[in-house]
Amino acid sequence: AESWFGGIAGREGDRETAADIEPLLKRTDLVADMSFYFLYEATDLLLREQNCKLENDGVLLNMLPGFYSQQSHLQRFTKLFEDQPINKEKLILTLPQSTVLSANKATLEVISRYIKNGINLLLDGWDYRSFPVDKVRELGIKAVRPDPSLYLSADFAGVLSSLPDLGITVYAAGTETSDAFRWLAACKVSHIAGPICGHEMTEDDIIRELLLKDRENA
């Protein structure tokens, strides 16, 4: 979200964008610190929603490439949750399926530690043919975002429909076609990881949308 970035010195009213920090994202030595920065800002957003007594299923963070090859920063995470008491289940971190399939023993241990400590990981780009449902459950994953190339498949429809009963939440990406949305709804998919129209939203946009929703339900 644009409002998650800071101001720019000497340019009053301007805010940093993803393009401004792109060079930093390419520095692998900053992956851990940048990831924690995004996590902190997402936690702050959830706390703001909580203080406004607004309901939201959570905030999904697309984690930086290489995040899971870093040493676990669970101690920092735990301290963060102590400072800002929120439900950890509402912070959802993406875990690319390709990362798991190519992970060495050390990386798998880091992933396992996050899951065991209540960090909610979403298996991104999930393909049931190369990563069966049983393997998802064995890993302890409770959320998946399917590979869009599998949409409209009759075989995959049966697999998706069975996941809610197994305690696994399925997320759409928010940029699907109307046909894909109808198919996903028929497969019992009711969560979208992003705005339905696919545009960027600031923190204030999210709060405003939740306030309007709360007013409609009053």
Task: Locate each region found by the language model.
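EAL-family c-di-GMP phosphodiesterase catalytic domain
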Residues: G6-D14, P65-F67, T94-S102, I119-A218
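Metal-dependent enolase-superfamily TIM-barrel catalytic cores that perform enediolate-based chemistry
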Residues: F38-Y40, I92, I111-N117
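Bacterial c-di-GMP phosphodiesterase EAL domain
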Residues: A1-P85
